[in-house]
Design a protein with these regions (language model features):
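Structural alpha/beta surface segment adjacent to cysteine/selenocysteine redox centers
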Residues: 17-106, 110, 188-192, 196-204
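Solvent-exposed beta-strand sheet faces enriched in polar/charged residues
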Residues: 6-8, 37, 157
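Residue-level signal for beta-strand positions within conserved beta-sheet cores that form or flank
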Residues: 1, 30-32, 164
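C-terminal cap of thioredoxin/glutaredoxin-like
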Residues: 22-24, 99-211
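Residue-level recognition of the N-termini of beta-strands and the immediately preceding loop/turn
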Residues: 3, 86-89, 154
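Local sequence-structure signature of Cys/Sec-based thiol-disulfide redox active-site neighborhoods
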Residues: 1-23
Length: 211
């Protein structure tokens, strides 16, 4: 049975993290299932190139390392393990400000995060296992086939596999709403996605707020 929403994430993207917390906030208020899927900023930007921006490339490499561990988590424990790992990754990277640890010492960082998620320690070693790249690349390509290639993360697909399946990039929000505000945004975004709107955008945004 298909989930009600597919959420495509790269763990190093702060905007995807905030959007994911909004999604989990609404999940507590509405009865729906989320399938946590992979999209790699490293793979997206490999085609575009980094033009000498080594900092971004290092961060995106770290994101791919995290996705490999998430793939190993899924292989062992399914979607629930991916959800637990992504929560632990986001809390460490974004809320805890530990992104540089992931970049500079990925194995030690991921061992710590896997432990926080309550998952088997051995999956942390998957960070350098490129055999996981096949599924990560496949899911990245699926996500981009639904939205077009000129986007990043997150990508959301409402009602996957259904006749009214609808995908979009975003929403990009600076702070995750809660309660009624979270539900209002959910209904608005789903309506826009299902209506066939291609783009609504402004480039001005506030800094991400993780509290």
């Amino acid at each position: 049975m298909a989930a009600d929403l597919e959420f495509y994430f790269d763990p190093v993207c702060p905007w995807a993290w905030i959007t994911s917390r909004w999604v989990t906030n609404v999940q507590q208020l509405r009865n729906y299932d989320v399938s946590w899927r992979f999209i790699s900023l490293k793979m997206i930007n490999a085609e575009r190139g980094y033009a000498g921006n080594n900092a971004y490339e290092l961060i995106h490499n770290a994101g791919l390392a995290g996705l490999r561990v998430a793939s190993a988590a899924r292989a062992q424990g399914g979607n629930a393990s991916v959800a637990a790992l992504y929560t632990a990754l986001g809390n460490a990277i974004h809320v805890g400000g530990r992104r540089e640890e992931l970049v500079n010492n990925p194995h030690a960082f991921l061992l710590s995060v896997v432990d926080d998620a309550g998952l088997p320690a051995e999956i942390a070693s998957a960070f350098e296992d490129s055999t996981h790249d096949e599924v990560i690349r496949y899911e990245t390509e699926v996500a981009l086939s639904r939205t077009g290639k000129d986007v990043g993360t997150p990508i959301l697909t409402f009602n996957p596999k259904a006749a009214n399946e609808a995908s979009l990039f975003g929403p990009v929000i600076s702070k995750a709403p809660t309660g009624d505000e979270a539900v209002k945004l959910w209904d608005a975004v789903q309506t826009i996605a299902e209506s066939g709107v291609a783009e609504i955008k402004r480039s001005l945004r506030a800094a991400p707020q993780f509290d």
